[in-house]
């Protein structure tokens, strides 16, 4: 199994993701090759909480242009993790 810290890359802090905190849902950018069970185990191991459900989605990178040069931002994968009632992740508490 992969190292859990390699699976969870960073938390997502947007207006939409902070609105989901009221429903006990936390959003993370995860490794492109990680599946739902790996994400669940990584969150449970790192934050010592119980995960009820994991929803994942692949987000395609956007095309960017600087003058005549075109490029693309990297593709990424987001995971919305629903925790058991009463569990919280401390890094999101100040939002």
Curated annotation (Swiss-Prot):
Pfam families: Ribosomal_L23. It comes from the Bacteria. GO terms for biological process: translation. One of its GO terms (cellular component) is ribosome. InterPro entries: Nucleotide-bd_a/b_plait_sf, Ribosomal_uL23-like, Ribosomal_uL23/eL15/eS24_sf, Ribosomal_uL23_CS. PROSITE patterns: RIBOSOMAL_L23. Gene3D superfamilies: 3.30.70.330. Part of the 50S ribosomal subunit. Contacts protein L29, and trigger factor when it is bound to the ribosome. Belongs to the universal ribosomal protein uL23 family. This is Large ribosomal subunit protein uL23. It comes from Desulforamulus reducens (strain ATCC BAA-1160 / DSM 100696 / MI-1) (Desulfotomaculum reducens).
């Amino acid at each position: 199994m992969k190292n859990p810290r390699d699976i969870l890359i960073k938390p997502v802090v947007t207006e939409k993701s902070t609105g989901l905190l009221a429903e006990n849902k936390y959003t993370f950018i995860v490794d492109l090759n990680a599946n739902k069970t790996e994400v669940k185990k990584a969150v449970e191991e790192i934050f010592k909480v119980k995960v009820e459900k994991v929803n994942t989605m692949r987000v395609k990178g956007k095309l960017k242009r600087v003058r005549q040069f075109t490029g693309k931002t990297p593709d990424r994968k987001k995971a919305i993790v629903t925790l058991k009632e009463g569990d919280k992740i401390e890094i999101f508490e100040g939002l």
